[in-house]
Amino acid sequence: MNRTRSLLVLMLIYASASLTHFIHNALHIRAYPNLPSWITPFGVYISWCAIAVIGVLGFWLYRRVSRSAGLLIIGLYALLGFGGLDHYLIAPVSAHTVAMNVSIIVEVVTAFVLLSFAALLMLLGEKRAAPM
């Protein structure tokens, strides 16, 4: 599997994990401990869509414009996956259900893997897009 395809696969895995976490958030919003009351299911879905657009933009830039610019945006996209850890700033791990913790941790782990791969590609310094 070439690097471009590997990057796309990792992005799709992270996007799936992130979507799963966000859907769980939206469906069980009032069960998440100490979430502000102004956070709504609709807002959760819109947030995920905005984050996904960043990922799509990053991959488009990577493939069509500039590998380094694309990888920077993909890195930002991956960093946003660490936002799930914010749940633990407002309530301890023990206050969350197993499903909540699993959805948070899987999102963070997949974000970390994507971020690491994007950083590796940056270090390798590829100059132009390769065909998929």
Question: What residue ranges belong to the model's regions?
Answer:
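Interfacial helix-start motif at the membrane-water boundary
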Residues: 38-54
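Non-cytosolic membrane-interface motifs at loop->transmembrane helix junctions
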Residues: 33-43, 94-107
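Interfacial segments of alpha-helical transmembrane regions
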Residues: 1-14, 66-75
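Hydrophobic transmembrane helix segments
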Residues: 10-42
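Hydrophobic alpha-helical membrane segments
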Residues: 44-47, 69-89, 108-113
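Juxtamembrane helix-break-helix junctions at the cytosolic face
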Residues: 53-69, 125
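Membrane-helix boundary connector in multi-pass membrane proteins
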Residues: 63-70, 83-104
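Membrane-water interface at the C-terminal end of transmembrane alpha helices
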Residues: 3-10, 108-132
